[in-house]
Amino acid sequence: MHFPKKKHSGNLSVVELPKEALQDSLTAAQITFKRYAHPNGNAGSAERPRHLKVESAPVVKSEPSLPRMRQPEPRSINHQYSRETLPGHSEAFSVPTTPLQTIHYDVRNKASNSPSSIAAAEAAAYLAHTNSFSNRSSGVGSRDPVMDTETKPPRAPSALKNELQLNRMRIPPPSYDNNVRSRSISPQVSYSTSLSSSCSISSDGEETSYREKSTDEAFPPEPSMSSYSLASKASAKASLTDPSQRQQESDYTAMNKLNGGNIIYKGTLPDLIPRSQRKTSKPRFKHKLLRSPEQQQENLSRVYSDQTQNGRAIINTQQNVKLKTTMRRGKYAITDNDETFPYDRKSVSSDSDTDEDSNVMEIKDKKKKSRRSKIKKGLKTTAAVVGSSTSVLPFPHHHHHHHQLHNPNSHHLHTHHHTSSHKFNEDKPWKSHRDLGFITEQERKRYESMWVSNRYSYLRLLPWWPSLANEDDESHLQPLNLPQDGLMLNLVVKDIWYRSNLPRDLLVQIYNMVDTRKDGTLDRKSFIVGMWLVDQCLYGRKLTNELDQRVWNSVDGYVLGTINVKPATSDHYHNANNPLDKPSKLSVRQELKNIKRDLRNVRI
């Protein structure tokens, strides 16, 4: 399995480590050599393997009190390095952060691949590299660029298992400093292993290029918990940028990964348009209509990819984000030259112009509606009377169509009136109620269903009802004159009427108006009229002192052509010859209105 080479570019400089760090590194290497070369406590039994050709490699150890010379640059936000300690040991030793020089492993026998020999070889490499580093000159500018690589031949699975436990300790990336835009890249020694069927592993080492840099541009010493690094990266653009701008760029750089982390989106959130800079809808619509197709093409989002950062495509939209109600906008479509999106372009282009067309259609509909409403307000028609079912005119609908066909210049708009039955609203019962003054067939059926389900209940509680003790003595029994429809106990009526949440005194008044038996029970007609009065009070009508006979008659029959006429207090028609006693035109007109209203309400 081949791993791709990872390139790190940037201005780097080499800084010499202090003597304390070198001494600590030597101590850590000696402890590692003792623990892994002699796991059973035999200090002198292990020998240094001869088949390893080891060159010098520096050893670096982390210490909180010493200054940090360089920070590793994280490849992505979600890519974190976990730091773990070896099981059974309380002390943690850091992995060297500088790339080791070429190390050749020659697998000849099983004894050379033992854990003790591998650990001894690695510790010897640390010590040799530390000694070579201490003998080097301290001049920073005199060092040439170095290219370090690491290659590993195949190893046995038993040796790889122990080596993986040793190299699990990873150094987490330090916290990013917003005030300093310069970053440093720390090459890390990574042991990448993959066990295939043939137990072969091949990996390409990390290639890290270093450039000379003067000591004046180096970072100031800072305390760090991570390991010391031998390279530091300087950025000349950091000193020229504004701190607030750097803060915004660092906070709103959106790393939205798609396709397994190969695409990174940047530059969407910082481009939100404030409300103060937004224009009104009319100039925007006018601009949409008058602009040329070339300008429309320029407004498309410019999406391009950049493959320079760790081999990942960075998608920069460079488009001001407007929070619309839909995502299917034409200017957010994908360009033809873009190859970063593997999606189907037909689905995107098919809905690209739907919103612009819908805006035009909405404005046209508004114009039509406004003109239609003006025409309706200016006309005085009697369509309700002509099109009603109780109209005296023969074929009213045919007459209406005939008028529209033979008068093309007429401004009357023919509209179809569909009478839809609205659902009864318990919170607003007056909307589905008509004040007729009598009980309709629908209301009577609803009241009769409650009557049938609750009659003959608890009648034994009545004092005049024959008791169980007197049932044995047939001589003392008296025949009861009960109505054919049955009776209902007043306690049951009280329980039903209390559900209306009307005041108690009002319910008592209704019961006294409909109680005709005066024995603690109600018959069918009294119960239905009482229920109707309760509903009338719920509809908002006031309770009258006396009930009209028409209400009692509507319980057992159908009311046709009734007229709501107020009862006259005195007889005005006793003398027809007297012109003063004749009804006035106003009263006649009011009676005609009442007749028309009742004809519309009652269906013949």
Swiss-Prot record:
Residues 469-559 form the EH domain. Residues 176-185 have a biased composition (Polar residues). GO terms for biological process: lipid metabolic process. Residues 276-290, 366-379, 396-421 have a biased composition (Basic residues). Gene3D superfamilies: EF-hand (1.10.238.10). Residues 38-77, 133-249, 267-300, 338-380, 394-428 are annotated as: Disordered. Residues 186-203, 224-240 have a biased composition (Low complexity). CDD domains: EH. SMART domains: EH. InterPro entries: EF-hand-dom_pair, EH_dom. Keywords: Lipid metabolism. It holds the Pfam family EH. With IRS4, acts as a positive regulator of INP51 activity and phosphatidylinositol 4,5-bisphosphate turnover. Negatively regulates signaling through the cell integrity pathway, including the MAP kinase SLT2. Belongs to the IRS4 family. Interacts with INP51. This is Protein TAX4. It comes from Saccharomyces cerevisiae (strain YJM789) (Baker's yeast). The gene is TAX4.
